[in-house]
Amino acid sequence: MPKVKTKSGAKKRFKLTGSGKIKRKSAYHSHILTKKSTKRKRNLVHAHLVSAADESNVRAMLKI
């Protein structure tokens, strides 16, 4: 039986925390930043957790 392969796009975008939650990077912080306020850009810098609704889909992509 072959090895189970992880989706490589998901592998690059998500990390597991020590408690088993899934971390993700915020979108909207790569370009077209001049119209966004400093506060908004600052809040986009921090990592966030994947929501409970999406967590099962992400776990399936990561095969965990």
Swiss-Prot record:
Residues 1-28 are annotated as: Disordered. Keywords: Ribonucleoprotein, Ribosomal protein. Disulfide bonds: none annotated. It comes from the Bacteria. Pfam families: Ribosomal_L35p. One of its GO terms (cellular component) is cytosolic large ribosomal subunit. InterPro entries: Ribosomal_bL35 (IPR001706), Ribosomal_bL35-like (IPR021137), Ribosomal_bL35_CS (IPR018265), Ribosomal_bL35_sf (IPR037229). GO terms for molecular function: structural constituent of ribosome. The keyword Kinase does not apply. One of its GO terms (biological process) is translation. Belongs to the bacterial ribosomal protein bL35 family. This is Large ribosomal subunit protein bL35.
